[in-house]
Curated annotation (Swiss-Prot):
The lineage of its organism: Eukaryota, Metazoa, Chordata, Craniata, Vertebrata. This is C-type lectin lectoxin-Lei1. Pfam families: Lectin_C. Ca(2+) binds at N142. Its main location: secreted. Expressed by the venom gland. Residues 34-155 form the C-type lectin domain. Residues 1-23 form the signal peptide. It is found in: Secreted. InterPro entries: C-type_lectin-like, C-type_lectin-like/link_sf, C-type_lectin/snaclec_domain, C-type_lectin_CS, CTDL_fold. Disulfide bonds join C27-C38, C55-C154, C129-C146. A motif (Sugar-binding) lies at residues 119-121. Keywords: Calcium, Disulfide bond, Glycoprotein, Lectin, Metal-binding, Secreted, Signal. Glycans are attached at N60, N99.
Length: 156
C-alpha cells in the first residue's frame, strides 16, 4: 500500500509539471513555467507582427517572448529544442522604426543580449525583427526582415 501511494504521488507530480504548473507560478494548462513566467511554442508560421498579435489574443498580457538572462535563454532553448523541429522562431525583439534601437514587445528593458557571432546587421535600411535558429541551438539572436514567416514563442 505504501508503495502504491508513493507511486501515485510521483505520477501526480509528473502530471503537474508536464501541464506547465511550476512550484513558483501557475500557468495555463498547456503553457510551461520558468521563474515567474509562462511560455508556449506556437507551431504556426506567421510574420512577426501577426505572431505578436496572435500571442496577445491567445492569453491576456501575452507577447512574443523577451529573454532577460542567460538562465532564461537556456530554458527557452530547451523548450524550442523539444518543440520547434528545426525551425527558426520569433522572439519579441523588434525595431519599431528603421535604423532605431531594438525594443522588446512587452516593454521590458535590456538585461541580457544574445547576438549571433556575426552580430546585428542592417545593410539594406529595412526594419528588422529577431529570431532564434536551431543552427545555434536556439541560443543566439539573429535579425531578419519582419515579413519572414516563422513559428514563435509567447510569454506571459
Amino acid at each position: 500500500m505504501r508503495r502504491f501511494l508513493f507511486l501515485s504521488l510521483g505520477v501526480l507530480v509528473v502530471a503537474f509539471s508536464l501541464n506547465g504548473i511550476g512550484a513558483d507560478h501557475h500557468c495555463p494548462w498547456d503553457w510551461f513555467s520558468f521563474d515567474r513566467f509562462c511560455y508556449k511554442v506556437i507551431k504556426q508560421r506567421k510574420n512577426w507582427q501577426d505572431a505578436e498579435r496572435f500571442c496577445g489574443q491567445l492569453q491576456n498580457g501575452s507577447h512574443l517572448a523577451s529573454i532577460q538572462s542567460w538562465a532564461e535563454s537556456k530554458y527557452v532553448a530547451m523548450l524550442l529544442s523539444n518543440n520547434a523541429f528545426l525551425d527558426t522562431v520569433w522572439i519579441g525583439l523588434f525595431e519599431p522604426e528603421k535604423n532605431r534601437s531594438l525594443e522588446w514587445s512587452d516593454g521590458s528593458g535590456f538585461c541580457y543580449t544574445g547576438w549571433e557571432r556575426r552580430k546585428r546587421n542592417n545593410v539594406d535600411n529595412k526594419k528588422y525583427c529577431v529570431e532564434l535558429s536551431w543552427m545555434s541551438d536556439y541560443l543566439e539572436w539573429n535579425n531578419v526582415k519582419c515579413e519572414s514567416r516563422n513559428i514563435f514563442i509567447c510569454k506571459i
